[in-house]
Amino acid sequence: MRSLLVVGVVLVGLTAACGTADPPSRRQAPSPGSPAVSPASPAAASASVRCDEGMDGAAAPPADFQVVGGAVALPTSDVREAALQASEATMPDGSPGSFAKQGLLVRRGRHVELSVPESLTGRTWLVWGKPGSPGARVVADRCQGDKEWIAFPGGYLVRDMGCLPIRVRVDGGAVQEVLIGVGAPCPGQGPAPQI
C-alpha cells in the first residue's frame, strides 16, 4: 500500500505544473525540490545526479513524457500539449531568470547524459537531484531501484523562457535532440498553464 501511495505521489509531482514551489533566490533558501543556487556557487559545466538522490520511481513514465533512447523520459514538445510553467528565479551567476520545476525519469541500470547546446551554455542549466547542482550537462550513471524508472526532482533554469533543445545520449550511443517548452511553447504546443 505504501509503495502505491509513493508511486502516485511521484507521478503527480512529475506531471503537475508545480507552480507553488519557490524558485531559487538570493533572498530565500530553496524549497525542497528546488535547486540550491546562489551567486556564490556558480554552476559547473557538468553535474552528476547521485543515485541516492532519486525518489521512489514508477513502473512506466506518464503519458505526457517521451521515452528517449529507451532510457530517459522527458516532457517533450512531441507529447506534451503545453509548455512547462516557469517562475522567477536567480541564476547561478546572480542574474534574474526562470525555473521550470519538472522531474526527470531515468530507466534503472542505464547511463544517461543530458546537455544543452554550447550556444545555450551560461544561459540554460539542468538541475536534478536533492538539492541538485546546476550544469549545462547532467549525468545519471546506472542507478538501481525497485521500480523500472527512477524519479529525480529538479528542473530547468533558464535566462530566457522558450523552446529549449535538450541533447540526450544513452549508454554512450548517438546523441538525440528533443525540444522542451520552458515557460514558453515550442511549435505545436500551447502556452504554459497559469495559476
Which residues make up each language-model segment?
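N-terminal export and membrane-targeting signals
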Residues: M1-L11
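C-terminal motif of bacterial Sec signal peptides marking the signal peptidase cleavage site
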Residues: L14-A17
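Non-catalytic macromolecular-recognition regions in eukaryotic signaling proteins
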Residues: L5, G19-I195
